[in-house]
Amino acid sequence: MNILPKKSWHVRNKDNVARVRRDEAQAREEEKERERRVLLAQQEARTEFLRKKARHQNSLPELEAAEAGAPGSGPVDLFRELLEEGKGVIRGNKEYKEEKRQEKERQEKALGILTYLGQSAAEAQTQPPWYQLPPGRGGPPPGPAPDEKIKSRLDPLREMQKHLGKKRQHGGDEGSRSRKEKEGSEKQRPKEPPSLDQLRAERLRREAAERSRAEALLARVQGRALQEGQPEEDETDDRRRRYNSQFNPQLARRPRQQDPHLTH
């Protein structure tokens, strides 16, 4: 730590401190010079503006007199004389515009959109409505046809068919209801409880079936089927004992017996 102040790059070194102070003083001088130039430029610009303003005020009466004698300034219009005389003006086709107006008026009258003051909608239409037409002789009266619903409602044959359909539906519902009631009564009829002898026989049958299934499973695990009434004999010879297969007992096999004559 004592060597650190003697390094040339140390911030507290005398040379470095003097260099920093010299740079700061130079920066301050440059900033002052820049501000002086800005103020000088602003002063010159203001002086020039005031000079131009004074010249403009002195020459204003002369300009007003010159403008009074000269024509008005503006864009040059080469066709002003033609427009004043009415030449070169594009005019539309009056006949075509009149035909379009009449066609539009006819369509609006047919639709009932265009009506004049004091005119009804019926008068505005090109054809009077059907209720204002006189009835023709020997033909059907104008207007909509008689209501078909009223005729069908007053038809006696249709009424008879409707009553017959309701009767058949009612009879079918009664037949299905009677069958359902009969089946429900049979299902709800309580059954006779079994006797004790029947329950005991079923229990013994279940126990015998479970016992035989357990014996068959053990025999399959050990790799051989037990004969009924024959007790299982344990193999004492390790070389003849079956291979142990904990997870796949059906794949366990007995080792192959070797011929004693071939071994010697």
From Swiss-Prot:
Signal peptide coordinates: none
Residue stretches in coiled coil: 16-46, 89-115, 196-222
GO cellular component: nucleoplasm
Basic and acidic residues composition-biased segments: 12-37, 146-162, 170-214
SMART domains linked: Cir_N (SM01083)
Sites bearing Phosphoserine, chain numbering: S59, S245
This protein's UniProt keywords: Coiled coil, Phosphoprotein
Record region (Disordered): 1-37, 49-76, 118-264
Compositional bias annotation for Low complexity: 59-75
Disulphide-bridged cysteine pairs: none
UniProt superkingdom: Eukaryota
Additional free-text comment from the UniProt record: Belongs to the leukocyte receptor cluster (LRC) present on 19q13.4.
Cited PANTHER family: LEUKOCYTE RECEPTOR CLUSTER LRC MEMBER 1, LEUKOCYTE RECEPTOR CLUSTER MEMBER 1
Protein name, entry field: Leukocyte receptor cluster member 1
Phylogenetic lineage: Eukaryota, Metazoa, Chordata, Craniata, Vertebrata
Gene from which the chain derives: LENG1
